[in-house]
């Protein structure tokens, strides 16, 4: 009998160890991991530089509270602000917490209370971030959501313009809706959102929780578009598996988050900061990010060449190493078959297979994954 709440639909796999792009279960099976803890282990499992950094901090101190000056927090904040164009950082423990902080900051800084998000978005499972999320399925049974959130269709600028008003504090935007189906933002829509924010004095919050920290081949995905955010949220890949999140903001917002206005007991924990510093030092190297771009191109071109002619495949889309394969039917049976063959992938909605390999994946491993996907989906097309 399990003593855990059954909040997760668990796979029938028990992982015992991991190294690089590989995971191993209690039956001795090896898996090529194209889930990465859901875009978390960007440097793969047990990356030696992250292990060494956390191990060193373990022998120093683990926690002293944010009443003290903690130099490693400043180091990580400097790395984040330098790469993002932001000016200040609030550390927390997860993406939902980062988005909660962003929502609070937007309301306090502007004195307004309405926030616009998009259908099929995902921003977290706290009451505030659940209200922000544009997917009804995660809200079932939890009663009324906060009424100050408005959801409009993604990539629909006319719908957005109809909703914004004098009480709109912020627009929250994902450049790629990872959980919602790997839906890519239209470049013209991105530029139009930016213009609407500037024209009406609305804060632009970009949720980079799944796309940030190099996943798309740039430090942050928004940097590939005409977007000038006031706030950015990150988590997932920031600690490579160590729980850490962050909200980044511009200079004009700093005074709104004065002492006592927000906080987190464990936010900026020294162990988490050690992991994050090691991750950012590695990922934010130009050669590393360039390699991610090249791997992303290889993955997309390989998938298009191998799968585009299959009847079951509706569309292949992605950016960098965040890729979705939309099918004509539900993806769950194929995800299970791939897992049984040693390739771990996951869904993004019912009909999309999502690929999130570690950013350190090799060219050979990308080819291996494409081959496995072709075998499974080709068989399905033959039987259709």
Swiss-Prot record:
Cofactor(s) it depends on: pyridoxal 5'-phosphate
Protein localization: Cytoplasm
CDD domains membership: OAT_like
Entry keyword set: Amino-acid biosynthesis, Aminotransferase, Arginine biosynthesis, Cytoplasm, Pyridoxal phosphate, Transferase
EC number: 2.6.1.11
A Pfam family: Aminotran_3
Gene3D superfamilies (UniProt xref): Aspartate Aminotransferase, domain 1, Type I PLP-dependent aspartate aminotransferase-like (Major domain)
Catalytic reaction annotation: N(2)-acetyl-L-ornithine + 2-oxoglutarate = N-acetyl-L-glutamate 5-semialdehyde + L-glutamate
Cofactor note: Binds 1 pyridoxal phosphate per subunit.
PANTHER family xrefs: ACETYLORNITHINE AMINOTRANSFERASE, MITOCHONDRIAL, AMINOTRANSFERASE CLASS III
Name of this protein: Acetylornithine aminotransferase
């Amino acid at each position: 009998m399990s003593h855990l709440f059954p909040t997760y639909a668990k796979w029938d796999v028990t992982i015992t160890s991991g190294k690089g792009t590989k995971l191993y279960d209690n039956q001795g099976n090896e898996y090529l991991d194209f889930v990465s803890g859901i875009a978390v282990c960007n440097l793969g499992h047990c990356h030696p530089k992250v292990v060494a950094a956390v191990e060193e901090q373990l022998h120093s101190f683990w926690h002293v509270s944010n009443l003290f000056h903690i130099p490693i927090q400043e180091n990580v904040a400097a790395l984040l602000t330098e790469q993002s164009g932001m000016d200040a950082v609030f550390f927390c423990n997860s993406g939902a917490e980062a988005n909660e902080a962003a929502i609070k900051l937007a309301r306090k800084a502007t004195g307004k209370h309405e926030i616009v998000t998009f259908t099929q978005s995902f921003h977290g499972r706290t009451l505030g971030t659940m209200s922000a999320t544009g997917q009804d399925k995660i809200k079932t049974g939890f009663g009324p959501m906060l009424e100050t959130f408005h959801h409009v269709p993604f990539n629909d600028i006319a719908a957005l313009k109809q909703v914004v008003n004098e009480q709109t504090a912020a627009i929250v935007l994902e450049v790629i809706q990872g959980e919602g189906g790997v839906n890519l933002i239209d470049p013209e829509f991105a530029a139009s959102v930016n213009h609407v924010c500037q024209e009406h004095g609305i804060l632009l919050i970009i949720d980079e929780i799944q796309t940030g920290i190099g996943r798309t081949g740039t430090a942050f995905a928004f940097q590939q578009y005409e977007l000038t955010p006031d706030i950015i949220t990150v988590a997932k890949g920031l600690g490579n598996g160590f729980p850490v999140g962050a909200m980044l903001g511009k200079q004009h917002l700093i005074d709104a988050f004065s002492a006592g206005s927000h906080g987190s007991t464990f936010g900026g924990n020294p162990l988490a900061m050690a992991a994050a510093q090691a991750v950012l030092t590695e990922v934010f190297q130009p050669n590393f990010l360039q390699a991610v771009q090249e791997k992303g191109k290889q993955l997309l071109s390989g998938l298009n060449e191998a799968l585009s002619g299959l009847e079951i495949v509706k569309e292949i889309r992605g950016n960098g190493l965040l890729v979705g394969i939309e099918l004509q039917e539900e993806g769950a049976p194929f995800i299970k078959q791939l897992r049984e063959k040693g390739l771990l992938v996951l869904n993004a909605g019912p009909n999309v297979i999502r690929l999130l390999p570690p950013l350190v994946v090799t060219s050979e491993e990308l080819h291996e994954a494409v081959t496995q996907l072709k075998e499974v989906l080709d068989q399905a097309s033959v039987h259709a």
